[in-house]
Structures are given as structure tokens and as C-alpha cells.
């Protein structure tokens, strides 16, 4: 799998950005961004979503010129508005993107495309899904409230299809709950009690945690299954419209398609072929997978997302989080992977060690550390990498540091309590 890279400076809360590796942030199979509120986590995830979509649009438009410079950067800025990033651009903003077959660059008011390799035959068109933090919209079904924000609307449409796909039932990693569509064609959460009794709750009345993870897991699983099993039958209809492609302009005089801001005609047969071509992989971009969830459930949801990402070789999972539990469990996934490898080296024929490891951390979710990058955003506008090549979390990690501060606070208060008790004993003689 190729590692997509971006370099960002002076964009929203991002100032200097990442200062190692020539400033390029790497996106392997799994990338996670942590850090305090307003430090740029979602800025990076929204930006990579936009850039990957632009690469896909350029591929569908059959762009093959040595270079395409668009003097007006409105294409890029218009797309950024989809994620409400329009106000993040500054006069000194610098953005570079290195994808599978295309490089993109934004400087000043100029947006340029360059070939990354000799050809793009290896490019696998992705289905890109952005899971916004504001995804607990299931009560809308009951209240018939509109979904207006573009990311939410896109997720809502996929969720409707996912519900139908999993109508017979879908297990949720919360206390044995299960999603299903009942005989009355109502979407419900089924809870089986210890005595065998069954309780059903309409999804719109379910807990905030269930409303947060149900769209996330159903849509993630549904998209990957469609790509992995039925790709021939599920063409990428979202790319088929010329109107949706920012690199295509229809001549008002002749009604012919041209590359935007140029006099070069679009190769129509190639455009139609690529537009109808099925997606070959899934890029799943998730804001705050831990939202409204108890720590054990946070870990269960992460492991489910990791397992889904492993269903196809070229799937990618990009996460932003505030949760130390999500960070620590992602690191634990690399330890589990190394233990599985050691079990193979031991020739664990009976599977004793593998069974014990699997009980602790399922093999389906275990990740090679080389397939993971973990970054931390800071209030000063910088980005640092916080997991080493062996899968170990660095002590400087912000969330790790906060956990240590909490432990130190308790130690300090226990010491004060002990001192006060000793003082009380001395007074009472």
C-alpha cells in the first residue's frame, strides 16, 4: 500500500505544522490524530478528505497532462467549504499533497496538479466517507428534521442504504445489543435480557452512545462489504455526473467538456469509463470514535473499525480523538500483532498462545506498527509524531501526560490526607 502524504502550513490553527520528514505527514493504513480542542486534529482530517476527493476527481476526468495550473484556486476553496474550512486560508497558506498518482500544490492563489508517477494504472479509486462528530442524528427519523450540513447529508444517505442492507440484524459492541428492522418495518435496538426476555427500543429513542456508533459502524461495514463482494454490481454513481467534477467545464458555445481553466478537451470515453468504474477501496475518516461512549465501548468500537479496515488491502482508516483509551488501545493493537508473530515463530501448532492472545485482543483487529502513524496536534500550531516505529507511545504524548498528571494529583491528595490524619492523631494525643 502506498503512503499518501500531505504537508500543511498556515492553515486554520495549523502554523508550522509537522517539522520532520520535510514537513510531510504520512497516511499509512491507519492514522490517528490526538490533541486538545481547537489544535487542528479535524482540520487535518477534513483537509485530507478534500485532497483525496480531488485526486479521485482528477482521475475520473482522465487528467494526464504533465502539469495543470489553475490560476484561480476557487476549485480548492469551493471544496473546502464542504467542510466549513473556507475561512482557514491565509495569504501564506502552503498545502502539498502526494497521492498514488497525482501531486497537488496550493500556494497563494494558485492550485496546481502534477503527475506523481509515469502512469496511474496502479491507482485504485476509493470510496471516501467522512464521519463527522455530529453524527448522532437518528432522532431525525422520528422528528423528520432536515439534515443540511453536507458531511451529515452524505452520511445520512449512506446510512439509509446501510439500514436496509443489515435489516435482518447487526450486532453492536455495547452489552450485546443488536440493530434490526422489526415486523413493523421500524428500526429498533434489541436488548436480550438474562432471563431470555427481549426489549426493543426505536433507534431514535436509543441512548446517545448508540446513536453515535450506529451510523458509524453500519455505514463503515456496509461500504466495505459492497466494495469487497459486489463491486461489479455497485458502480461509483457519485462520480458519474460531469456537474460534480470540479475539473470539468462545459463550453457554453459548443457544449463540449474541457479541463477547467484550460482549452484542453476532456476524453469523453475515458471519462465515462472511469466514472462508471466501481470503487476499489474504502477511505474511512472518523471524527471522535469515542463520542458518548464508556471506555470499554470506546475500545470495542476502535477494534471493530480496525477489523473493517483490514477487510480490504487498500482500505484506510483516519481518526481524530480526545480519548486516551482510543490512543492506548491502538498502541495495544501493535503489541497484539507482535505477539501473534511470536506465536508463529514458536510453531504454536495447537494454537494455545494464539488462543490466549486472541482472548485479549482479536487477531482481526491487531495491526502491524508499520501500518500505523499516530500524530499529536498542539495549540502552538505544530504537529508531532507520538508513536515510534516499534509501536511504543512516547512519554511526551499529551494524553499520556494528562493521565500521569491525574495519577500525580491523586498521589498528592493521598499524601495530604495521610498528613492530615497524622496531625489529627497528634492533637488527640
Kindly label every feature range from the protein language model.
Residues 287-289:
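Walker B catalytic acidic pair
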Residues 300-305:
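Conserved hydrophobic alpha-helix in the ABC-type ATPase nucleotide-binding domain
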Amino acid at each position: 500500500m502506498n503512503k499518501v502524504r500531505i504537508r500543511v502550513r498556515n492553515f486554520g490553527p495549523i502554523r508550522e505544522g509537522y517539522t520532520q520528514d520535510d514537513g510531510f505527514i504520512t497516511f499509512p493504513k491507519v492514522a490517528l490524530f490526538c490533541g486538545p480542542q481547537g489544535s487542528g486534529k479535524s482540520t487535518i482530517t477534513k483537509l485530507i478528505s478534500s485532497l483525496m476527493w480531488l485526486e479521485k476527481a482528477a482521475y475520473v476526468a482522465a487528467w494526464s497532462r504533465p502539469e495543470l495550473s489553475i490560476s484561480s484556486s476557487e476549485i480548492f476553496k469551493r471544496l473546502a467549504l464542504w467542510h466549513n474550512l473556507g475561512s482557514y486560508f491565509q495569504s501564506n497558506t502552503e498545502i502539498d499533497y502526494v497521492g498514488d498518482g497525482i501531486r497537488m500544490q496550493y500556494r497563494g492563489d494558485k492550485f496546481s496538479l502534477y503527475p506523481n508517477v509515469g502512469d496511474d494504472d496502479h491507482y485504485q479509486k476509493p470510496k471516501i466517507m467522512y464521519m463527522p462528530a455530529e453524527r448522532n442524528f437518528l432522532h431525525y427519523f422520528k422528528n423528520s428534521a432536515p439534515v443540511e450540513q453536507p458531511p451529515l447529508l452524505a452520511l445520512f444517505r449512506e446510512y439509509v442504504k446501510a439500514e436496509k442492507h443489515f435489516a435482518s440484524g447487526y450486532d453492536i459492541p455495547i452489552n450485546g445489543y443488536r440493530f434490526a428492522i422489526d415486523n413493523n418495518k421500524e428500526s429498533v435496538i434489541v436488548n436480550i435480557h438474562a432471563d431470555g426476555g427481549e426489549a426493543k427500543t426505536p433507534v431514535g429513542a436509543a441512548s446517545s452512545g448508540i446513536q453515535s456508533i450506529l451510523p458509524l459502524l453500519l455505514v463503515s461495514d456496509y461500504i466495505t462489504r459492497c466494495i469487497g463482494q459486489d463491486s461489479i454490481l455497485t458502480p461509483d454513481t457519485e462520480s458519474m455526473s460531469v456537474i460534480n467534477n470540479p475539473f470539468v467545464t462545459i463550453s457554453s458555445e459548443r457544449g463540449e467538456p474541457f479541463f477547467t481553466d484550460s482549452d484542453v478537451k476532456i476524453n469523453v470515453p475515458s471519462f465515462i469509463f472511469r466514472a462508471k468504474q466501481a470503487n476499489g477501496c474504502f477511505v474511512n475518516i472518523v471524527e471522535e470514535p469515542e463520542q458518548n461512549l464508556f471506555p470499554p465501548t470506546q475500545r470495542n468500537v476502535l477494534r471493530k473499525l480496525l477489523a473493517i479496515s483490514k477487510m480490504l488491502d487498500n482500505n484506510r482508516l483516519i481518526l481524530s480523538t480526545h480519548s486516551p483509551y482510543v490512543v492506548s488501545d491502538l498502541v495495544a493493537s501493535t503489541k497484539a500483532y507482535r505477539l501473534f508473530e511470536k506465536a508463529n515463530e514458536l510453531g504454536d501448532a495447537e494454537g494455545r498462545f494464539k488462543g490466549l492472545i486472541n482472548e485479549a485482543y482479536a487477531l482481526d483487529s491487531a495491526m502491524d506498527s508499520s501500518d500505523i502513524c499516530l500524530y499529536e496536534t498542539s495549540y502552538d500550531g505544530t504537529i508531532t509524531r507520538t508513536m515510534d516505529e516499534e509501536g511504543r507511545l512516547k512519554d511526551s504524548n499529551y494524553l499520556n501526560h494528562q493521565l500521569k498528571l491525574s495519577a500525580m494529583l491523586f498521589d498528592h491528595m493521598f499524601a495530604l490526607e495521610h498528613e492530615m490524619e497524622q496531625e489529627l492523631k497528634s492533637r488527640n494525643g
